[in-house]
């Protein structure tokens, strides 16, 4: 069904960032069962048991359906956050479930979404009859998700290689910034 799973993951991840800043344990306790646990349990249930990746959903840009690196990374980060919330509240079984699932998602990201040949993370993968079909579009959200949600450290060779590859391919934009992905025409202005 048409969902955008990163929207679920980002709420849980952001709540952890809020907690790190506020230390408002009472608030977290008040929303743990109704929001954090329900969202985390959904993410655990929405994993492809054969690959370890989240099941397909729409990407960050709401354009393509599949398993994007950004979404998989956000699910990883959210499950780690859910594990931390569970530990904080003494819910050992929940913590174990969320952390174990997050570790499987991380392994699957590195197995299915990294390209040794291209030296970058794929935008997306789909599976047909068990075989991966890759979308090799250079998408800056892919590498952003990898280091933002701590799948890999920013100095990890895969992250460094991805950034170098993207810089080489994308070039520089005269006014600064980078395109969302290769071939992006969102708000593109003519050079005429």
Residue map of PLM features:
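Acidic side chains
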Residues: 6, 24, 41, 59-62, ...
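C-terminal ends of transmembrane alpha-helices
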Residues: 45-57, 111-116
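Acidic/His metal-coordination segments adjacent to aromatic residues that form catalytic metal sites
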Residues: 1, 49-67, 128
């Amino acid at each position: 069904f048409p969902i955008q799973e990163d929207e679920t993951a980002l709420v849980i991840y952001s709540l952890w960032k809020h907690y790190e800043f506020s230390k408002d344990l009472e608030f977290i306790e008040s929303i743990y069962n109704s929001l954090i646990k329900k969202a985390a349990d959904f993410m655990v249930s929405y994993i492809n048991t054969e690959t370890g990746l989240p099941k397909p959903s729409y990407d960050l840009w709401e354009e393509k359906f599949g398993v994007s690196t950004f979404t998989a990374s956000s699910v990883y980060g959210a499950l780690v956050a859910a594990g931390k919330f569970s530990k904080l509240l003494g819910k050992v079984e929940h913590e174990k479930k969320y952390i174990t699932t997050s570790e499987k998602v991380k392994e699957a990201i590195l197995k299915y979404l990294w390209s040794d040949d291209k030296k970058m993370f794929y935008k997306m993968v789909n599976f047909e009859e068990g075989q991966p079909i890759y979308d090799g579009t250079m998408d800056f959200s892919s590498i952003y998700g990898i280091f933002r949600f701590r799948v890999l450290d920013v100095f990890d060779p895969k992250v460094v290689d991805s950034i170098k590859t993207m810089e080489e391919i994308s070039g520089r934009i005269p006014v600064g910034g980078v395109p969302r992905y290769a071939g992006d025409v969102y708000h593109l202005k003519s050079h005429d």
